[in-house]
Amino acid sequence: MSSSTSQTTSRAGRLTLPVEKRMDAQVAELLERLQADAVRNSDGTELPEIVNKLATKIYQTYFVGRGDQDWAQTHPRELTRIYLMSERTPALADGELSIDLMTNWFVDQVYPDTDCDVERWWQVIDRTTGDVIAPGAWHVDPAGLSVTMDQAQAGHVYTVGFLAVQRWDPTQMYNYLTNGWADDPQRIKESPYDIRYPQTWQHVRHTLDQWLADNPQVDVVRFTTFFYHFTLVYGSDGTERFVDWFGYSASVSVPAMEAFEKRFGYPLQAEDFIDEGWYNSPFRVPRKSFRDWISFQHEFVTSRMAELVEQVHAAGREAMMFLGDNWIGTEPYGPHFAHTGIDAVSYTHLRAHE
């Protein structure tokens, strides 16, 4: 064997090539030149038919918590939620004070959840004193976009911590806006749904089984990723306002918080997630409630991961997880990750390999 052949053989494999339709010639040429051992699609792209003729593994992106917009639209109460804080609003005089909720938030992405028990799950706080304002001293205005206090104190600054519905998945939103998908009439804005709701969880499981049956050519299911997105919220200008790769602010729901109280014996409040507007950033010392929430969600997410991985294995396929996007609760360094049964973890940021 020549030295050049030996070098080529030693380089083969361990490389995944992202491909899409209408690039058949380029796919074949790149696979040969780069010695890639697998191909995959990406968010918003589809695999070309030519991949079925290539002697290589086929990975296909699979979204668990979005992609079925019919389900999302017919189950709006089962979309994912996020805790947000209004702008800090000063009272210039004693008496009534109106606080706008959506100032500087992107209305295409989020809107206030007024279907929940707002007196239980929202909070108004005097940031000057740190006092929580009793629910009876404020009310949500009819349009659901502002809160009015009855007796604000002049010179004091107030905020509203509110539960918001995520109407647009953050990653799909980013790709949609960045790539100009608005010009493509076939593109739709995808809403994320929450598997904490039993109906949605059963729908997710059934959909995966059907997808596996309909796609026998796929060797590896590349989950991208699972259920809860890291904190990524846009401002009113349609650009990133708050991003936290480790953020848990978007992993909340009323059923989850109620289950948390039963498990840990104490209730959560909006401020446990809002954290004075820091949203439990990694630069903050985590409080007990936040550490408990991470533990609680990690255990839940990994248990559900294991069930989906088992479905994939039962269909004779491998299961891979992309370390990003909806990765909250899947942390490989967490104590329950080893029990998920996942076959591989991929990470592509700033790298050309998986």
Where are these regions (language model features)?
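Active-site-proximal, well-structured secondary-structure segments within enzyme catalytic domains
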Residues: 248-296
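Conserved beta-strand positions
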Residues: 39-41, 223, 347
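Aromatic-lined carbohydrate-recognition surfaces of secreted/lumenal glycan-active proteins
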Residues: 17-18, 222, 297-331
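Aromatic- and glycine-enriched glycan-recognition loops and surfaces
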Residues: 198-206, 293-307
